[in-house]
């Protein structure tokens, strides 16, 4: 489906894609950038379809001038001294003509920047990084350099719904250090208060700054600026564990045991990589609890909620839970023709579940490769060929009795890589890339 709707030189896939059959389609068949259009491309790189990802990157580059004009015309984004903000961001709803619709999604451009970076991370295309990716990422960083808000000790200056926090709420801010940086007046899509330091925003900005710093150092550019950005990264308000052991969605510890469809505060688990079982086990356990709270009933039962939960459970090493999400999508939100339904019909579920399943099979976000990091009891044996890992490495492997039995790695240039297989670390040398290896992966049995 992605091959059919997203090629170099074309527009990216949108909500209903080429399969829209409405004169007035739901949500105008647009690009919703608070999850939907990004989800459509979660499988592009790991499923070895990098060329399909180019359509999204090129679209972001093409609409940047209009977004820049709109962002700089918005006086609400002005700097403290009244000057227009540098850089740009986006409104939630965009269309094929570059128009911006429903309300500002202030961290939306930062989410686009992750896709821009990931295309480099998987392909290793240095020319792309220098000429296209880095300039876009740097300008999006400029927006946040100008837009971030500095809090005083104990959260002085913090606002929730435009007002000072209550005395009870202030207790949750007591540990905030002077100089802490927060995204002002944010929103955890699509519920809760308008508030400073919403975790979804904080996580996106941290991902943006971190990846842009890496890009600058790879290219040997802007050393002083990258160092300054690193200083801001360290000052960002970070993830917090709440009173019940949950990963907080806001700096104020609300307990939203809700079936809300968005899992925005878990961005740091996936598609971000700030939280993992190996690097941050306490935060990972808190994220696990928060994911359990969201559940899979009511509002959580949507075409695109299942893929995100699939990927989240996979990143947390819970293969059987991830498999439950795959089955949930098929049972509750898939039409007889195999297209997914929100309802109504939307393509993001079809696209996104590919990315989720890829995360169950191979992960490469933590600095090495992890082969079948989330084994599934319902998949006792099987094989897959042609998956892609970061660093432009192609992966073939098979498994039997729930254990990986054979792994082959391919790359254009020989590499020795840290690889985790069946829970144990080893080092493997890549084989020469064979003709045809970079074709689309075969489905796992």
Regions found by a protein language model. Name each.
Residues 371-412:
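Surface beta-strand/loop "capping" patches
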């Amino acid at each position: 489906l992605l091959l059919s709707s997203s090629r170099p030189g074309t527009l990216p896939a949108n909500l209903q894609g080429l399969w829209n059959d409405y004169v007035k389609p739901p949500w105008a068949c647009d690009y919703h950038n608070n999850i939907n259009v990004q989800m459509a491309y979660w499988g592009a790189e790991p499923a070895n379809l990098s060329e399909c990802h180019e359509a999204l990157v090129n679209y972001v580059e093409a609409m940047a001038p209009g977004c820049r004009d709109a962002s700089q015309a918005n006086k609400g984004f002005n700097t403290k001294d009244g000057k227009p903000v540098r850089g740009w961001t986006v409104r939630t709803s965009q269309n094929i003509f570059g128009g911006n619709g429903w309300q500002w999604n202030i961290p939306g451009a930062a989410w686009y920047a992750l896709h821009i970076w990931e295309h480099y991370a998987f392909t290793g295309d240095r020319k792309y990084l220098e000429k296209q990716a880095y300039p876009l990422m740097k300008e999006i960083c400029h927006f946040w350099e100008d837009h971030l808000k500095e809090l005083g000790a104990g959260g002085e200056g913090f606002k929730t719904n435009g007002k000072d926090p209550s005395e009870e709420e202030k207790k949750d801010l007591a540990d905030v250090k002077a100089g802490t940086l927060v995204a002002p007046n944010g929103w955890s899509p699509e519920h809760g208060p308008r508030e400073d330091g919403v975790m979804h925003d904080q996580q996106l900005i941290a991902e943006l700054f971190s990846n842009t710093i890496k890009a600058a150092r790879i290219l040997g550019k802007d050393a002083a600026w990258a160092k300054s950005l690193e200083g801001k990264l360290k000052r960002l308000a970070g993830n917090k564990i709440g009173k019940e052991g949950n990963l907080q969605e806001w700096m104020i510890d609300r307990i939203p045991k809700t079936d809300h469809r968005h899992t925005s505060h878990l961005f740091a688990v996936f598609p971000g990589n700030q939280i993992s079982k190996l690097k941050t086990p306490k935060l990972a356990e808190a994220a696990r609890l928060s994911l359990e709270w969201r559940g899979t009933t009511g509002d959580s039962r949507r075409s695109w909620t299942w893929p995100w939960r699939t990927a989240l459970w996979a990143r947390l090493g819970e293969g059987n839970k991830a498999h439950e999400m795959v089955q949930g999508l098929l049972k509750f939100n898939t039409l007889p023709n195999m297209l997914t339904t929100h309802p109504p019909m939307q393509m993001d579920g079809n696209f996104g579940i590919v990315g989720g399943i890829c995360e169950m099979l191979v992960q490469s976000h933590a600095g090495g490769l992890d082969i079948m990091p989330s084994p599934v009891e319902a998949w006792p044996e099987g094989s897959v060929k042609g998956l892609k890992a970061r660093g432009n490495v192609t992966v073939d492997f098979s498994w039997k009795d729930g254990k990986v039995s054979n792994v082959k790695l391919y790359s254009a240039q020989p590499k020795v890589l840290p690889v985790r297989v069946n829970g144990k670390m080893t080092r493997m040398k890549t084989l020469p890339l064979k003709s045809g290896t970079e074709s689309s992966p075969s489905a796992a049995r």
